[in-house]
Design a protein with these regions (language model features):
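Structural/interface elements that position substrates and couple domains in central-metabolism enzymes
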Residues: 2-83, 91-144
């Protein structure tokens, strides 16, 4: 049963199962210093397949050496997680797209919380983490 994951055991189980992560709102190499680039770069470095889904940059065809997709639903294959780098008020426009793909979980990065979107995702059977940094939690809980 899907749930809002807030406990450390749930976070640990989630980050230890990550193999393929779509990053909604990923930045390009030109914004290397921003978390929306550095977090997915870290995830790729530790062996997680990163699927870039930029919201802007229509001319960009690759980020982190991977082909970009313009929607979550267009990504072939299964996703363990959609890592979201969008302002809280901008998440609602992506909920149906995320539900259509049905990843195992959705992660709203540190400072990002949208309870209504989280509720819809959980009701659709998708686990949700809000207001936490994936890089911090992964480096804290990932099996060494």
């Amino acid at each position: 049963m899907a749930r809002l994951i807030e406990d450390e055991a749930g976070i640990s189980a989630l980050v230890n199962g990550l193999k393929r992560v779509a990053v909604l709102g990923i930045k390009t190499e030109g914004q290397r210093g921003q978390p929306a680039y550095s977090v997915p770069e870290y995830m790729q470095r530790v062996g997680v397949e990163v699927v870039p889904v930029p919201v802007y940059y229509p001319e960009v065809t690759q980020i982190l050496g991977q082909p970009v997709f313009r929607t979550i639903a267009a990504i072939p294959g299964e996703l363990d997680l959609v890592d979201v780098f969008r302002r809280p008020q901008d998440i609602d426009q992506h909920v149906d797209d995320i539900i259509a793909k049905h990843p195992k979980a959705v992660w709203f990065q540190l400072g990002i919380r949208n309870d209504e979107a989280a509720k819809k995702l959980v009701e659709a059977g998708i686990d949700v983490v809000q207001d936490r940094c994936l890089l911090v939690e992964h480096s804290k809980f990932a099996a060494k």
